[in-house]
Structure formats: C-alpha cells, structure tokens
Amino acid sequence: MDSAVSKLGFIPDGQLPKLINQDAVTLELKKCRDSIRKRIRTYNFKEPKLTDDEITKLAAKICGASEERKSYRKILAILLLIDRPSRITHFVDEGVSDQDLPLEIVETLSTRPLRRRSFDLRRRGDPLAKPLRCFMCPRKWRKSTVERFEKYQWSLLAPFLSQDGPRLFRFKIPDKAILPFERWERIGQQGGFSHVYEAEIHPDHHGFHVQDLDAQDGRGDHGHETTTNPPSTRSNVFAVKRLKTQNRDDFLHEFDMHKRVSKNLHQHLIPLLAAYEQHGIYHLIFPLAGADLEKYWRNKEQETNQEAARWVAEQCQGLAGAVAAIHRSYTLSDSLSFRALPGGQSEGETQGVNMSQTNGPPTSIPRQRFAGHCRHGDIKPKNILWFPDGSRQQKETTPRGTLRITDFGAAQYAEHRVPTSGSQNTPIYRPPEADLTAQGTEPDVIVGTSYDIWSLGCVFLEFVAWFLDGWHGVQIFLENRSTVDRACHNFHTGKFFLIESGDAGKTSRARVKPEVDQVRSRPPQPSSLRYLRD
C-alpha cells in the first residue's frame, strides 16, 4: 500500500493475516525446502530438511497458532520483501518474533585493520546488547542485506492512531515509521503558525469515531454536563494541523488546552482526536470540517426565511455556550503544562480541589494556587468551523450543519482580576481593552475572559450582515468601518471601536464605531426575523 507521506509503502495490519496465512506459509516453506539442495551445492553448508509435518507445524507457529502464541508473520513478510524467506527458520529458532520489531541498529568496530565501521541489528533495550544469531546463519549476512531488512521492517510497523474514550493520546512516532496516510493534501491558506492537511488514514490504522455531537445527551445550553458516548459515524478522512513551531512547550500548551476542555466537551467546540510528534514536528488530528465560517459566508447563498433565521440564532447561542464552557475551564499554578498569561499573578488559593485527571481517577490537590480561567484569545470566522452533517436533530430536508470553535493555539489562562497584555488576537476582532492597556492610558483595565465576548459579538454582527445581505453585505460592512489603525502600524483595519483621546488630565476612552450601530438601526425586517436583529 502506497503512503502519501513516504516513498516506502506499508502493509495494513488487516491485510497481513490474509497474505500470511497458514496455507500460504506452508506453500512458501515447501518452495524454500525444494531450493535448499541448490544452496547446499553452491555454499557448501548444511541446512536441515523439513518434512511435510514439520512444515505444517512451523507454518502454524509462524502464524501464531501454536502454544507460544508468538507471531512471526511480520518477520516472514520482511524476509519475503528482501527475497530471503528461507531464513525464517533461524528467527523462529532464536525466538525473534514480531513483538521484537523494530530491531535496532547497533554500530560495531571491525577487528580487522582498515575496515570501515559495521553494524548489526539487535533487540530494543537488550541490556547485554547481544548480537542476534539469526543474522549470522548459515553465514553472516551481507551489510546490504541487513540494511534492507532494517529498512523494510518499517513497512510492517505503520502506527495505529487512536483515542480511549475521553482520554487523549499523544504519540511519539519514530522518525523512520511510515504513516498510514493514503492521502495527504494541504487545504486552505497557509496560516501564521500552522498548516492544515486533509489526511485519509487507512481504516486498519486508526480507532477514531467522529461523533455526532448533536446527538449527545450532555449538550446542554452551556455545556455543563459531561457528554456520553453516543452512536458514532466512522470516517477515514481527517484534518491534521501541522504546527510550524518546534517548541515543545507551545505544542504541549495547545494539546493540554484541548485536553482540559475535552473533559466536558461542548457541542460547539471542535474535539481533538489525537496528537503526534515525528521528525521534531508536532501534529494535531481533528475531524474534517466542510469549511470555516468565512468561507461558508463567501460560498453559501443566504436565506432570509424563518427556518434560516432560527438556525443562525441557534448557532449563535451554541457558540456563546461554547465560549462560556472555555471560560469555565481553569488550571492550578502547579500544572506546569499550562502556560500563564504574561504578567499574570494569581490571587487566592484552592484547597482540596478535585481535578479529574485525563489518565486516571480524580485526585485531591491540596493548597495549590489558582492560576486562572481560560480564554480562547483568537475568536474569528476563520477559527469557527462548519460541519455540514452535524445537525441531524433539525427537522428539515437539508440539515444546515453545526458551527464549532477551533484553534486553541492562542488560548491562555489568567485570573480574571489580573491585567494582561501581549495577546495574539486577530486585530479586527480585538476588544478596546487591548488598545487601552497597550497605550498605558488605562493600566488597570482588565483584559480577561471578556476579551472573547467582544470578539464573539463582532462575529455575530458579521453573521447578521451575511444573513441580511450575503457575502456582499459582509464586505460592505468591513469597508464602511475600515479606518487607519495606529495600533497596527497605521494600516487600515476593520476593528469595531475607536479610541478617543481625553482632554488634559483625562484618560482616553473607547466607543463603538458609528458603522457598527448602523447594523442595529437598519429598518425592521419581516416580523418573523425581527428577533434575530435584536
């Protein structure tokens, strides 16, 4: 099977028992026996001749059907790939089985003068580092043959990616491992901190079930309840986010943020399926969305009927509940895997707080300092994904889908009474507090969880503009409020507020741009749609 990310292919786990079965192994062993005479005459070594009964027993042993319950299927497959199937008997005799793979390369110094460094293959973690006899029978293998064995063993060791219920797995994949990706295509525009790929993972090599979150019992208005495990739909196509950073702390920060919010996953939050590291590059695996919200607005023609208005209102309510769920997440100062906001100083203490651990039962954590609630930090249309088949409970012919918040790369924890700065929020959707704090005119202005509320409100206004006038309405709304932004090197941005300088001795103040108020002051729509405008 070809791999989309490696020149060398892989053999899917489910195919191996079909290819290496007792009948096929018996036939191959008999072929090897018949060719032994030629090798004896050529190399002048003794090779034991196997009877038919011995071959049958050996085939059962190779396929794991003997009392040992060891399998040598992968070993035989590797030997077939390098055209050395008759050597399987030496591996079986020494007990070098599939569970010993991958064998490690160990460099050795030749005792002969003027000879280059050599190497052999040995079991992983062997404290005595014993050379394996199977690579010396009937004579020492050539270096090129050993290299081929080491190379092709990875074709049988494609990793299995999975999750275990609410637990998230983080995999450290060997650099030589062949990922079981049958398709790997970049999607969307290049982001500032990551690339996103559409990856088709072979069904034998993942255990992900993309849940229909609308069917979960624990959806709730604000995501208070823990979701159950509902019937799920299986897909082999996922979104893989490849981080540009090679800083492990940045990767662990985003992973841990997802792990924290996944404990009570809200219907309108994207679930992280797993994460992995290979070649020092970090990846996060998610369900594949149909589009981000901006692309949805651009390509989807709006409908101004009551059902469409209800859907927009429901999605806005759901997104607000998802943001509230994020804000209810918190951490303690001793949780080193969480990154505190710059300058954040915790106040107060938490005694005996029960924190449900991802990989174990709840534990009591005595007297740890409260490090703060979480805020997303970068809510914008591009960080809201549209899933076309996510609203199965809607009683309509064509489900309109579900919106879910994604990208926790900028999410941070900060005690909500502590001033913070240095946000990575997209300039257009930043709140006035960010500019007032940055200018130093209001050093006591709080930039906390309200940061997200402002950003989400901006998205809602654009959502209404799209609902009323389509993508053209979104663009006109942006053009009307676009002004020179001193905080962004005097570029024009479409932020939603103005900073008015105060008179002598007075502080600056922020106010909403008039163009924003114009959206609310538009003439009323049909009576069935008025509630959406409000």
What are these regions (language model features)?
Residues 279-292:
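Conserved short submotifs of the Hanks-type protein kinase catalytic core
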Residues 300-318, 341-347:
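Activation segment of protein kinase catalytic domains, centered on the conserved DFG
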Residues 434-526:
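Conserved C-lobe activation region of Hanks-type protein kinase-like domains
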Residues 238, 263-275:
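Conserved HxN/HPN-centered segment at the entrance to the catalytic loop
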Residues 327-398:
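Catalytic-loop of the protein kinase fold
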